[in-house]
């Protein structure tokens, strides 16, 4: 049930009846719930367009919609607001529908093919904290769009091609390590050594470039080593994905190498279409849409003098593939803000070449950095980048210490399971609860707190409801009486439950999980107020008990579903 949309449509219908069209009513939650649960916020702006005083316009709108069953009362307040008090009986009817719905009353939308490009680590390197935001924010979007009925194509655009593989293969050859046991940790160590050698040893650099050419030309020996490197890396990455409880699997890997065979044809085609030209041995596209420091059209190199391809070339091919082969209607990229201009340039070239439709929805959902308390990039004490596995290990250990203090007699198996769910959930929620467009301060104490907008607080709210339901000893099938709402805290909780669909639809458009986190926190606090003000298990009447149990069940279902969309698990006991 999308309450905001319903109110908005009612207002638009009322405006049309008084010959006011093309207006966009802005509906917000009202902080003063006693006079209205929702509020029309831009009445003055609409009144100015219609040459009416706000009070006159408000009266006309109210006259047209006040008889609708949904509203208990509609009032005007100065200087220019309309307040909508929702009818508790109408709210109860909506809750009954949701109670019987496995999807909490949320319908499927018209399906689109949506590619979500996220995580995208590099081969031969361990995942680090820089990969966390892309991985978990992208995964929330994938889960939500899946739930709404879209055909979601998860694309893990791994860096599995390029000069670094020539370096690594050459190093493994020189050091006679090709047939030795290799781990991802060792591969990263060898890559660092290979890079240093490449920068100072001309013969080694030449050999590395030869291996790159061989690999690009399909040399079987180089290809077998490359495949081994990819396999070792992805095996470890998939372990991280499993620990993070994200939906990325090995089958979602769509690395840069997929597009390698397309690149020569794309260069030729862009030349033939006069989009690209050769200059000083390189192939360049000059884009008037982008200016260099001198105010001239910016040049985007798509092939180097040595005939090597660049990231821009790969991204153009990738776009063509996603549109023409995967039939994407919408493509969402989760990379940091530094990639923004690069992506815009690739999109512009792909459109000029008619590789993609002008109507294809292309979105770059940028995100900020994770910072330490001194507002610097979050690193180890030695200044190294923190590995994601180490971060999750510490989260689990810290959660374990907290749980041991609260439940010292817990079995080792239960302790490990609970520590993992709470620790990893806390890290994810701390990140997801911040606006992705901004940097945020990483704080262990804050994220593992059982107070405030944290995962443990919301997980605990869920377990508390489970405990209440268990104490009631009332099977769900016996809860046949209708929900009825009399107290303010009941009504406020009910309206918060109805708000869930609106939140999910908003995130599906904007890709901002912090809105869902904020909603779940407010839902949990609304339940807390309800619990404090209304006896659930021991009211005067049994029908009141059953009604409040149903309201509690709906809250628990919504909390669980919301956390699931964030990729965070619930527990029945904390």
Curated annotation (Swiss-Prot):
<dbReference type="InterPro" id="IPR035684">
    <property type="entry name" value="ArgRS_core"/>
</dbReference>
<feature type="short sequence motif" description="'HIGH' region">
    <location>
        <begin position="121"/>
        <end position="131"/>
    </location>
</feature>
<keyword id="KW-0067">ATP-binding</keyword>
<keyword id="KW-0436">Ligase</keyword>
<dbReference type="GO" id="GO:0005737">
    <property type="term" value="C:cytoplasm"/>
</dbReference>
<comment type="subunit">
    <text>Monomer.</text>
</comment>
<dbReference type="GO" id="GO:0006420">
    <property type="term" value="P:arginyl-tRNA aminoacylation"/>
</dbReference>
<dbReference type="GO" id="GO:0005524">
    <property type="term" value="F:ATP binding"/>
</dbReference>
<dbReference type="InterPro" id="IPR008909">
    <property type="entry name" value="DALR_anticod-bd"/>
</dbReference>
<dbReference type="InterPro" id="IPR014729">
    <property type="entry name" value="Rossmann-like_a/b/a_fold"/>
</dbReference>
<protein>
    <recommendedName>
        <fullName>Arginine--tRNA ligase</fullName>
        <ecNumber>6.1.1.19</ecNumber>
    </recommendedName>
</protein>
<keyword id="KW-0030">Aminoacyl-tRNA synthetase</keyword>
<keyword id="KW-0547">Nucleotide-binding</keyword>
<dbReference type="InterPro" id="IPR005148">
    <property type="entry name" value="Arg-tRNA-synth_N"/>
</dbReference>
<dbReference type="InterPro" id="IPR001412">
    <property type="entry name" value="aa-tRNA-synth_I_CS"/>
</dbReference>
<keyword id="KW-0963">Cytoplasm</keyword>
<dbReference type="Pfam" id="PF05746">
    <property type="entry name" value="DALR_1"/>
</dbReference>
<dbReference type="GO" id="GO:0004814">
    <property type="term" value="F:arginine-tRNA ligase activity"/>
</dbReference>
<dbReference type="InterPro" id="IPR036695">
    <property type="entry name" value="Arg-tRNA-synth_N_sf"/>
</dbReference>
<comment type="similarity">
    <text>Belongs to the class-I aminoacyl-tRNA synthetase family.</text>
</comment>
<dbReference type="Pfam" id="PF03485">
    <property type="entry name" value="Arg_tRNA_synt_N"/>
</dbReference>
<keyword id="KW-0648">Protein biosynthesis</keyword>
<dbReference type="InterPro" id="IPR009080">
    <property type="entry name" value="tRNAsynth_Ia_anticodon-bd"/>
</dbReference>
<dbReference type="InterPro" id="IPR001278">
    <property type="entry name" value="Arg-tRNA-ligase"/>
</dbReference>
<dbReference type="Pfam" id="PF00750">
    <property type="entry name" value="tRNA-synt_1d"/>
</dbReference>
């Amino acid at each position: 049930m999308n309450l905001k949309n319903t109110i908005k449509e009612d207002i638009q219908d009322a405006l049309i009846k008084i010959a006011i069209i093309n207006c966009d009513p802005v509906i917000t939650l009202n902080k003063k719930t006693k006079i209205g649960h929702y509020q029309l916020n831009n009445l003055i702006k609409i009144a100015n367009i219609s040459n009416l005083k706000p009070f006159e316009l408000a009266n006309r709108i109210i006259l047209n919609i006040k008889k609708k069953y949904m509203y208990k009362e509609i009032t005007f307040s100065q200087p220019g607001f309309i307040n909508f008090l929702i009818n508790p009986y109408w709210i109860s009817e909506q809750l009954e529908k949701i109670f019987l719905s496995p999807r909490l009353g949320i319908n499927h939308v018209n399906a689109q093919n949506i590619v979500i490009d996220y995580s995208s680590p590099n081969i031969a390197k361990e995942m680090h904290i820089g990969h966390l935001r892309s991985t978990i924010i992208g995964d929330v979007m994938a889960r939500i769009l899946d739930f709404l009925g879209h055909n979601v194509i998860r694309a893990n655009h791994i860096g599995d091609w390029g000069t670094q593989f020539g370096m690594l293969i050459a190093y493994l050859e020189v050091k006679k390590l090709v047939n030795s046991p290799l781990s991802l940790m060792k591969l990263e160590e060898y890559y660092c050594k290979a890079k240093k050698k490449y920068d100072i040893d001309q013969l080694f650099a030449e050999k590395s470039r030869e291996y790159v050419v061989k690999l690009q030309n399909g040399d079987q020996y180089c290809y077998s080593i490359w495949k081994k490197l990819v396999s070792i890396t992805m095996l470890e990455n998939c372990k991280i994905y499993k620990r993070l409880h994200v939906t990325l699997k090995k089958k979602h890997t769509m690395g840069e190498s997929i597009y390698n065979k397309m690149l020569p044809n794309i260069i030729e085609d862009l030349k033939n279409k006069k989009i690209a030209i050769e200059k000083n041995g390189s192939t360049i596209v000059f884009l008037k849409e982008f200016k260099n420091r001198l105010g001239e059209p910016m040049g985007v190199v798509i092939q180097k003098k040595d005939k090597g391809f660049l990231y821009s070339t790969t991204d153009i091919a990738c776009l063509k593939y996603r549109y023409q082969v995967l039939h994407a209607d919408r493509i969402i990229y989760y990379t940091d803000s530094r990639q923004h201009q690069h992506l815009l340039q690739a999109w512009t070239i792909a459109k000029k070449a008619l590789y993609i439709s002008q109507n294809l929805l292309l979105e770059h959902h940028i995100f900020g950095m994770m910072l330490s308390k001194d507002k610097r990039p979050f690193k180890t004490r030695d200044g190294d980048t923190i590995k994601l596995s180490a971060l999750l290990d510490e989260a689990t250990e810290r959660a374990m210490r907290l749980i041991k203090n609260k439940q010292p007699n817990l079995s080792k198996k239960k302790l490990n399971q609970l520590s993992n769910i709470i620790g990893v959930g806390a890290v994810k929620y701390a990140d997801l609860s911040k606006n992705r467009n901004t940097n945020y301060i990483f704080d262990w104490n804050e994220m593992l707190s059982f107070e405030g907008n944290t995962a443990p607080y919301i997980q605990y709210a869920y377990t508390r409801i489970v405990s209440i339901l268990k104490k009631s000893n009332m099977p769900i099938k016996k809860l046949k009486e209708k929900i009825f709402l009399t107290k303010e805290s009941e009504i406020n909780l009910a309206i918060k439950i109805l708000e869930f669909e609106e939140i999910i639809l908003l995130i599906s458009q904007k890709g901002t999980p912090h809105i869902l986190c904020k909603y779940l926190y407010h839902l949990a606090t609304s339940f807390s107020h309800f619990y404090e003000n209304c006896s659930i298990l021991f009211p005067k009447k049994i029908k009141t008990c059953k009604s409040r149990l149903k309201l509690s069940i709906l809250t628990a279902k919504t909390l669980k579903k919301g956390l699931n969309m964030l990729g965070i698990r619930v527990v029945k006991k904390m």
